[in-house]
Amino acid sequence: MKSIVSKAQQYLEQERNSRFSEEIKDFETPKIVVVGCGGSGNNTVHRLSNMNVSSAMTIAINTDKQQLLRTKADKRVLIGRSITRGLGAGGYPEIGRKAAELARNVLEDLLCDSDMVFVCAGMGGGTGTGSAPVVADVAKKQGAIVIGFAQMPFRVERARIQKALDGLEEMKEVCDTVVVLDNNKLLDYYPNLPIDAAFSVMDQLIAETIKGISDTITIPSLVNIDFADVKAIMGHGGVAVMLVGEAKAQDKANAVVRDCLSHPLLDVDYRGATGSLVHISGGHDLTLKEAEEIIRNLTFEIDDYANVIWGARIDKEFEGFVRVVSIMTGIKDRDFVGSLSYENVLQKQKLRDIRVESRNNGEKLRKQQSFSEPVKFRREKQKVSIPIIDRL
Protein backbone atom coordinates (compact mmCIF):
# COMPACT_ATOMS: atom_id res chain seq x y z
CA MET A 1 0.00 0.00 0.00
CA LYS A 2 2.86 2.39 0.83
CA SER A 3 4.38 1.90 -2.61
CA ILE A 4 1.09 2.81 -4.24
CA VAL A 5 0.88 6.00 -2.19
CA SER A 6 4.48 6.82 -3.04
CA LYS A 7 3.89 6.39 -6.76
CA ALA A 8 0.72 8.44 -6.57
CA GLN A 9 2.63 11.31 -5.00
CA GLN A 10 5.44 10.89 -7.51
CA TYR A 11 3.19 11.32 -10.52
CA LEU A 12 0.87 13.90 -8.96
CA GLU A 13 2.64 16.91 -10.45
CA GLN A 14 2.76 15.26 -13.86
CA GLU A 15 -0.97 14.57 -13.74
CA ARG A 16 -1.66 18.18 -12.81
CA ASN A 17 0.18 19.44 -15.87
CA SER A 18 -1.38 16.98 -18.31
CA ARG A 19 -4.88 16.63 -16.96
CA PHE A 20 -6.63 17.25 -20.28
CA SER A 21 -5.98 15.62 -23.60
CA GLU A 22 -6.15 17.62 -26.82
CA GLU A 23 -9.47 15.99 -27.60
CA ILE A 24 -11.04 17.16 -24.34
CA LYS A 25 -9.67 20.68 -24.83
CA ASP A 26 -11.81 20.98 -27.94
CA PHE A 27 -14.95 21.05 -25.79
CA GLU A 28 -16.21 24.47 -24.81
CA THR A 29 -16.14 25.52 -21.18
CA PRO A 30 -19.21 27.18 -19.66
CA LYS A 31 -19.45 30.89 -20.37
CA ILE A 32 -19.59 32.68 -17.02
CA VAL A 33 -20.30 36.40 -16.82
CA VAL A 34 -20.17 38.69 -13.79
CA VAL A 35 -22.19 41.91 -14.08
CA GLY A 36 -21.73 44.68 -11.52
CA CYS A 37 -24.62 47.16 -11.40
CA GLY A 38 -24.17 50.54 -9.76
CA GLY A 39 -21.42 51.62 -7.38
CA SER A 40 -21.36 48.53 -5.17
CA GLY A 41 -21.53 46.14 -8.11
CA ASN A 42 -18.77 48.05 -9.89
CA ASN A 43 -16.55 47.68 -6.83
CA THR A 44 -17.02 43.91 -6.89
CA VAL A 45 -16.20 43.70 -10.59
CA HIS A 46 -13.17 45.96 -10.08
CA ARG A 47 -11.81 43.62 -7.40
CA LEU A 48 -12.41 40.58 -9.58
CA SER A 49 -10.50 42.21 -12.41
CA ASN A 50 -7.59 43.00 -10.09
CA MET A 51 -7.54 39.33 -9.10
CA ASN A 52 -6.84 38.53 -12.76
CA VAL A 53 -9.82 36.19 -12.95
CA SER A 54 -9.73 34.32 -16.25
CA SER A 55 -12.69 32.02 -15.75
CA ALA A 56 -15.35 34.72 -16.14
CA MET A 57 -16.00 37.86 -18.18
CA THR A 58 -16.62 41.01 -16.14
CA ILE A 59 -19.08 43.75 -17.11
CA ALA A 60 -19.56 47.04 -15.26
CA ILE A 61 -22.84 48.93 -15.70
CA ASN A 62 -23.54 52.38 -14.31
CA THR A 63 -25.32 55.67 -14.91
CA ASP A 64 -22.38 57.53 -13.35
CA LYS A 65 -19.65 58.12 -15.94
CA GLN A 66 -16.95 59.01 -13.40
CA GLN A 67 -17.55 55.86 -11.35
CA LEU A 68 -17.47 53.78 -14.51
CA LEU A 69 -14.16 55.27 -15.65
CA ARG A 70 -12.60 54.27 -12.32
CA THR A 71 -13.81 50.68 -12.67
CA LYS A 72 -11.61 47.99 -14.20
CA ALA A 73 -13.65 45.47 -16.23
CA ASP A 74 -13.66 43.61 -19.54
CA LYS A 75 -16.68 45.66 -20.66
CA ARG A 76 -17.99 48.96 -19.33
CA VAL A 77 -21.46 50.19 -20.23
CA LEU A 78 -22.82 53.66 -19.51
CA ILE A 79 -26.61 53.39 -19.41
CA GLY A 80 -29.23 56.14 -19.32
CA ARG A 81 -27.05 58.68 -21.09
CA SER A 82 -30.10 60.58 -22.37
CA ILE A 83 -31.70 60.59 -18.91
CA THR A 84 -28.87 61.26 -16.48
CA ARG A 85 -26.21 62.72 -18.83
CA GLY A 86 -23.72 60.43 -17.09
CA LEU A 87 -24.26 62.03 -13.68
CA GLY A 88 -25.90 59.10 -11.88
CA ALA A 89 -29.42 58.16 -10.84
CA GLY A 90 -29.52 60.34 -7.73
CA GLY A 91 -30.66 57.48 -5.52
CA TYR A 92 -33.88 56.92 -7.49
CA PRO A 93 -34.36 53.24 -8.49
CA GLU A 94 -36.96 54.17 -11.10
CA ILE A 95 -34.28 56.13 -13.00
CA GLY A 96 -31.87 53.20 -12.82
CA ARG A 97 -34.60 50.86 -14.04
CA LYS A 98 -35.54 53.09 -16.97
CA ALA A 99 -31.87 53.51 -17.93
CA ALA A 100 -31.42 49.73 -18.03
CA GLU A 101 -34.60 49.25 -20.04
CA LEU A 102 -33.36 51.70 -22.65
CA ALA A 103 -30.14 49.67 -22.90
CA ARG A 104 -31.88 46.28 -23.09
CA ASN A 105 -30.67 45.61 -26.64
CA VAL A 106 -27.07 46.28 -25.61
CA LEU A 107 -27.44 43.99 -22.60
CA GLU A 108 -28.88 41.22 -24.76
CA ASP A 109 -25.83 41.34 -27.03
CA LEU A 110 -23.42 41.27 -24.09
CA LEU A 111 -25.13 38.36 -22.34
CA CYS A 112 -25.78 36.30 -25.46
CA ASP A 113 -24.85 32.59 -25.09
CA SER A 114 -24.04 32.95 -21.39
CA ASP A 115 -24.37 29.81 -19.28
CA MET A 116 -24.13 31.42 -15.84
CA VAL A 117 -24.51 35.09 -14.94
CA PHE A 118 -23.71 36.61 -11.56
CA VAL A 119 -25.54 39.91 -11.02
CA CYS A 120 -24.00 41.95 -8.19
CA ALA A 121 -25.58 45.09 -6.78
CA GLY A 122 -26.04 47.05 -3.61
CA MET A 123 -29.69 47.45 -2.69
CA GLY A 124 -31.08 50.83 -1.63
CA GLY A 125 -29.44 53.16 -4.15
CA GLY A 126 -30.57 54.23 -7.59
CA THR A 127 -28.61 52.48 -10.34
CA GLY A 128 -27.97 49.15 -8.61
CA THR A 129 -31.46 48.73 -7.17
CA GLY A 130 -33.16 49.73 -10.41
CA SER A 131 -30.95 48.14 -13.06
CA ALA A 132 -30.00 44.80 -11.45
CA PRO A 133 -33.46 43.20 -11.86
CA VAL A 134 -33.51 44.29 -15.52
CA VAL A 135 -30.06 42.78 -16.14
CA ALA A 136 -31.11 39.57 -14.40
CA ASP A 137 -34.27 39.40 -16.50
CA VAL A 138 -32.27 39.82 -19.72
CA ALA A 139 -29.83 37.08 -18.69
CA LYS A 140 -32.68 34.77 -17.70
CA LYS A 141 -34.38 35.19 -21.06
CA GLN A 142 -31.05 34.37 -22.74
CA GLY A 143 -31.21 30.96 -21.06
CA ALA A 144 -28.54 31.50 -18.40
CA ILE A 145 -28.57 30.45 -14.77
CA VAL A 146 -28.82 33.77 -12.91
CA ILE A 147 -27.33 34.16 -9.44
CA GLY A 148 -27.86 37.48 -7.73
CA PHE A 149 -25.69 38.92 -4.97
CA ALA A 150 -27.77 41.53 -3.12
CA GLN A 151 -25.85 43.65 -0.64
CA MET A 152 -28.24 45.18 1.91
CA PRO A 153 -27.64 48.61 3.51
CA PHE A 154 -26.52 49.46 7.02
CA ARG A 155 -29.13 50.38 9.61
CA VAL A 156 -27.81 53.95 9.65
CA GLU A 157 -28.71 54.33 5.96
CA ARG A 158 -32.35 54.90 6.88
CA ALA A 159 -33.57 56.31 3.57
CA ARG A 160 -32.26 53.28 1.68
CA ILE A 161 -33.92 50.52 3.71
CA GLN A 162 -37.39 50.40 2.16
CA LYS A 163 -35.96 50.86 -1.34
CA ALA A 164 -33.55 47.99 -0.63
CA LEU A 165 -36.35 45.67 0.49
CA ASP A 166 -38.38 46.52 -2.62
CA GLY A 167 -35.35 45.92 -4.83
CA LEU A 168 -34.70 42.57 -3.15
CA GLU A 169 -38.25 41.44 -3.90
CA GLU A 170 -37.71 42.28 -7.58
CA MET A 171 -34.43 40.35 -7.61
CA LYS A 172 -36.15 37.30 -6.11
CA GLU A 173 -38.69 37.33 -8.93
CA VAL A 174 -36.15 37.23 -11.79
CA CYS A 175 -33.08 35.42 -10.37
CA ASP A 176 -32.77 31.67 -9.97
CA THR A 177 -30.95 32.21 -6.68
CA VAL A 178 -30.36 35.39 -4.67
CA VAL A 179 -27.55 35.41 -2.14
CA VAL A 180 -28.56 38.03 0.43
CA LEU A 181 -25.71 39.75 2.27
CA ASP A 182 -26.44 41.94 5.29
CA ASN A 183 -23.83 44.65 5.85
CA ASN A 184 -25.00 44.96 9.45
CA LYS A 185 -23.57 41.53 10.25
CA LEU A 186 -20.06 42.83 9.59
CA LEU A 187 -20.60 45.62 12.11
CA ASP A 188 -21.97 43.08 14.59
CA TYR A 189 -18.89 40.88 14.20
CA TYR A 190 -16.39 43.75 13.92
CA PRO A 191 -17.91 46.74 15.75
CA ASN A 192 -14.76 48.86 15.46
CA LEU A 193 -14.55 48.49 11.70
CA PRO A 194 -15.17 51.79 9.84
CA ILE A 195 -18.10 51.77 7.43
CA ASP A 196 -15.91 52.25 4.36
CA ALA A 197 -13.74 49.33 5.48
CA ALA A 198 -16.87 47.21 6.01
CA PHE A 199 -17.96 47.94 2.44
CA SER A 200 -14.51 46.91 1.26
CA VAL A 201 -14.62 43.64 3.21
CA MET A 202 -18.01 42.70 1.75
CA ASP A 203 -16.83 43.50 -1.79
CA GLN A 204 -13.80 41.28 -1.23
CA LEU A 205 -15.96 38.42 0.09
CA ILE A 206 -18.27 38.53 -2.91
CA ALA A 207 -15.40 38.75 -5.38
CA GLU A 208 -13.48 35.84 -3.86
CA THR A 209 -16.63 33.70 -3.67
CA ILE A 210 -17.46 34.25 -7.34
CA LYS A 211 -13.84 33.67 -8.36
CA GLY A 212 -13.67 30.48 -6.31
CA ILE A 213 -16.85 29.05 -7.86
CA SER A 214 -15.90 30.09 -11.40
CA ASP A 215 -12.35 28.76 -11.15
CA THR A 216 -13.48 25.44 -9.70
CA ILE A 217 -15.92 24.98 -12.59
CA THR A 218 -13.58 25.94 -15.42
CA ILE A 219 -10.02 25.38 -14.16
CA PRO A 220 -8.58 22.02 -13.04
CA SER A 221 -8.69 21.83 -9.24
CA LEU A 222 -8.19 19.20 -6.57
CA VAL A 223 -11.95 18.54 -6.62
CA ASN A 224 -13.83 20.24 -9.44
CA ILE A 225 -17.43 21.43 -9.24
CA ASP A 226 -19.43 20.19 -12.19
CA PHE A 227 -21.42 22.91 -13.96
CA ALA A 228 -24.46 20.64 -14.21
CA ASP A 229 -24.43 20.16 -10.42
CA VAL A 230 -24.20 23.91 -9.85
CA LYS A 231 -27.11 24.35 -12.22
CA ALA A 232 -29.14 21.77 -10.30
CA ILE A 233 -28.59 23.56 -6.99
CA MET A 234 -28.73 27.17 -8.14
CA GLY A 235 -31.40 26.69 -10.81
CA HIS A 236 -34.22 26.79 -8.26
CA GLY A 237 -32.34 27.88 -5.17
CA GLY A 238 -34.58 30.79 -4.23
CA VAL A 239 -33.05 32.71 -1.35
CA ALA A 240 -29.56 31.76 -0.19
CA VAL A 241 -27.24 32.62 2.67
CA MET A 242 -23.45 32.69 2.50
CA LEU A 243 -21.23 31.34 5.28
CA VAL A 244 -17.54 32.22 5.35
CA GLY A 245 -14.83 30.91 7.65
CA GLU A 246 -11.06 30.65 8.00
CA ALA A 247 -8.81 28.72 10.36
CA LYS A 248 -5.09 28.29 10.94
CA ALA A 249 -5.27 26.01 13.96
CA GLN A 250 -3.91 22.48 14.02
CA ASP A 251 -7.48 21.21 14.20
CA LYS A 252 -8.43 23.47 11.30
CA ALA A 253 -11.23 21.23 9.96
CA ASN A 254 -13.37 21.77 13.07
CA ALA A 255 -12.14 25.31 13.64
CA VAL A 256 -13.14 26.51 10.18
CA VAL A 257 -16.64 25.03 10.54
CA ARG A 258 -17.10 26.81 13.87
CA ASP A 259 -15.96 30.04 12.23
CA CYS A 260 -18.44 29.55 9.37
CA LEU A 261 -21.42 28.79 11.58
CA SER A 262 -20.70 31.71 13.91
CA HIS A 263 -20.38 34.25 11.08
CA PRO A 264 -23.40 33.93 8.77
CA LEU A 265 -23.92 36.99 6.56
CA LEU A 266 -27.70 36.78 6.96
CA ASP A 267 -29.52 36.00 10.20
CA VAL A 268 -31.91 33.29 8.99
CA ASP A 269 -32.52 29.67 9.93
CA TYR A 270 -30.69 27.70 7.24
CA ARG A 271 -31.13 24.30 8.89
CA GLY A 272 -33.83 23.36 6.40
CA ALA A 273 -31.80 24.38 3.34
CA THR A 274 -32.43 22.20 0.30
CA GLY A 275 -29.02 22.70 -1.30
CA SER A 276 -25.47 23.51 -0.34
CA LEU A 277 -22.52 24.56 -2.46
CA VAL A 278 -19.25 24.36 -0.53
CA HIS A 279 -15.89 25.60 -1.78
CA ILE A 280 -12.70 24.80 0.15
CA SER A 281 -9.37 26.54 -0.41
CA GLY A 282 -6.27 25.12 1.23
CA GLY A 283 -2.58 24.45 0.87
CA HIS A 284 -0.87 21.22 -0.10
CA ASP A 285 -1.23 20.11 3.51
CA LEU A 286 -5.03 19.87 3.13
CA THR A 287 -6.01 16.21 3.47
CA LEU A 288 -8.99 14.35 2.07
CA LYS A 289 -10.07 13.49 5.62
CA GLU A 290 -10.11 17.17 6.58
CA ALA A 291 -12.14 18.10 3.50
CA GLU A 292 -14.69 15.35 4.18
CA GLU A 293 -14.93 16.37 7.84
CA ILE A 294 -15.57 19.99 6.87
CA ILE A 295 -18.39 19.03 4.50
CA ARG A 296 -19.99 16.63 6.98
CA ASN A 297 -19.99 19.05 9.91
CA LEU A 298 -21.04 22.05 7.84
CA THR A 299 -24.08 20.31 6.33
CA PHE A 300 -25.06 18.29 9.40
CA GLU A 301 -28.27 20.20 10.17
CA ILE A 302 -29.63 20.86 6.68
CA ASP A 303 -32.35 18.80 4.99
CA ASP A 304 -31.62 15.05 4.88
CA TYR A 305 -32.28 15.01 1.14
CA ALA A 306 -30.44 18.24 0.37
CA ASN A 307 -28.28 18.35 -2.73
CA VAL A 308 -24.72 18.95 -1.51
CA ILE A 309 -21.81 19.58 -3.88
CA TRP A 310 -18.33 20.68 -3.02
CA GLY A 311 -15.08 21.62 -4.63
CA ALA A 312 -11.55 22.06 -3.34
CA ARG A 313 -8.72 24.16 -4.68
CA ILE A 314 -5.06 23.89 -3.71
CA ASP A 315 -3.12 27.14 -3.61
CA LYS A 316 0.29 27.82 -2.13
CA GLU A 317 -1.09 31.04 -0.62
CA PHE A 318 -3.18 28.89 1.74
CA GLU A 319 -0.33 26.85 3.19
CA GLY A 320 -1.06 26.24 6.88
CA PHE A 321 -4.66 27.39 6.85
CA VAL A 322 -7.97 26.75 5.13
CA ARG A 323 -10.84 28.94 3.92
CA VAL A 324 -14.40 27.72 3.39
CA VAL A 325 -17.23 29.49 1.58
CA SER A 326 -20.64 27.84 1.64
CA ILE A 327 -23.84 28.95 -0.07
CA MET A 328 -26.98 27.43 1.46
CA THR A 329 -29.93 27.57 -0.95
CA GLY A 330 -33.66 27.07 -0.56
CA ILE A 331 -33.89 28.95 2.74
CA LYS A 332 -37.39 28.59 4.16
CA ASP A 333 -37.33 31.65 6.41
CA ARG A 334 -38.88 34.42 4.31
CA ASP A 335 -39.08 37.07 7.03
CA PHE A 336 -36.37 39.30 5.61
CA VAL A 337 -37.38 42.37 7.57
CA GLY A 338 -36.63 40.48 10.77
CA SER A 339 -33.55 38.74 9.46
CA LEU A 340 -32.04 41.95 8.14
CA SER A 341 -32.13 43.67 11.54
CA TYR A 342 -34.33 46.51 10.33
CA GLU A 343 -37.26 46.10 12.76
CA ASN A 344 -36.40 49.05 14.99
CA VAL A 345 -35.57 51.36 12.10
CA LEU A 346 -38.72 50.51 10.17
CA GLN A 347 -40.85 50.77 13.32
CA LYS A 348 -39.45 54.25 14.02
CA GLN A 349 -40.08 55.27 10.42
CA LYS A 350 -43.64 53.96 10.66
CA LEU A 351 -44.29 55.90 13.86
CA ARG A 352 -42.75 59.00 12.32
CA ASP A 353 -44.99 58.63 9.25
CA ILE A 354 -48.02 58.26 11.51
CA ARG A 355 -47.06 61.43 13.41
CA VAL A 356 -46.50 63.34 10.18
CA GLU A 357 -49.83 62.15 8.80
CA SER A 358 -51.58 63.05 12.05
CA ARG A 359 -49.98 66.52 12.03
CA ASN A 360 -50.98 67.07 8.40
CA ASN A 361 -54.53 65.97 9.10
CA GLY A 362 -54.65 68.35 12.07
CA GLU A 363 -53.48 71.24 9.92
CA LYS A 364 -56.11 70.44 7.29
CA LEU A 365 -58.78 70.33 9.96
CA ARG A 366 -57.70 73.69 11.37
CA LYS A 367 -57.76 75.22 7.90
CA GLN A 368 -61.27 73.94 7.34
CA GLN A 369 -62.38 75.42 10.64
CA SER A 370 -60.70 78.81 10.12
CA PHE A 371 -62.50 81.75 8.52
CA SER A 372 -61.10 84.02 5.89
CA GLU A 373 -63.01 87.09 7.15
CA PRO A 374 -64.71 88.03 10.39
CA VAL A 375 -68.25 86.84 10.78
CA LYS A 376 -70.91 89.26 11.90
CA PHE A 377 -73.38 87.75 14.26
CA ARG A 378 -76.90 89.19 14.13
CA ARG A 379 -79.34 88.84 16.89
CA GLU A 380 -82.63 87.89 15.44
CA LYS A 381 -85.59 89.98 16.46
CA GLN A 382 -88.04 87.88 18.27
CA LYS A 383 -91.66 88.73 18.56
CA VAL A 384 -92.59 88.73 22.19
CA SER A 385 -96.23 88.35 23.01
CA ILE A 386 -97.17 90.75 25.78
CA PRO A 387 -100.30 89.83 27.63
CA ILE A 388 -102.99 92.48 27.44
CA ILE A 389 -104.27 93.55 30.80
CA ASP A 390 -107.77 94.95 30.68
CA ARG A 391 -108.17 98.20 32.40
CA LEU A 392 -110.58 98.20 35.17
UniProtKB/Swiss-Prot annotation:
One GO biological process this protein is involved in is: protein polymerization
Keywords from UniProt, A to Z, are: Cell cycle, Cell division, Cytoplasm, GTP-binding, Nucleotide-binding, Septation
UniProt binding sites for GTP = 126-128, 157, 160, 203
GO terms of molecular function: GTP binding; GTPase activity
Q: Which InterPro entries match?
A: Cell_div_FtsZ, Cell_div_FtsZ_CS, FtsZ/CetZ, FtsZ_C, Tub_FtsZ_C, Tubulin/FtsZ_2-layer-sand-dom, Tubulin/FtsZ_GTPase_sf, Tubulin_FtsZ_GTPase
The organism's superkingdom is given as Archaea
Chief localisation class: cytoplasm
List the GO terms this entry assigns under cellular component, sorted alphabetically.
cell division site; cytoplasm
Q: Where in the cell is it found?
A: Cytoplasm
Record's subunit section? Homodimer. Polymerizes to form a dynamic ring structure in a strictly GTP-dependent manner. Interacts directly with several other division proteins.
Report the family membership.
Answer: Belongs to the FtsZ family.
Role description = Essential cell division protein that forms a contractile ring structure (Z ring) at the future cell division site. The regulation of the ring assembly controls the timing and the location of cell division. One of the functions of the FtsZ ring is to recruit other cell division proteins to the septum to produce a new cell wall between the dividing cells. Binds GTP and shows GTPase activity.
Against HAMAP family, the record matches this protein to: FtsZ
Mind telling me which NCBIfam families this protein's record contains?
ftsZ (TIGR00065)
Q: What is this protein called?
A: Cell division protein FtsZ 2
Q: What phylogenetic lineage does the species belong to?
A: Archaea, Methanobacteriati, Methanobacteriota, Archaeoglobi, Archaeoglobales
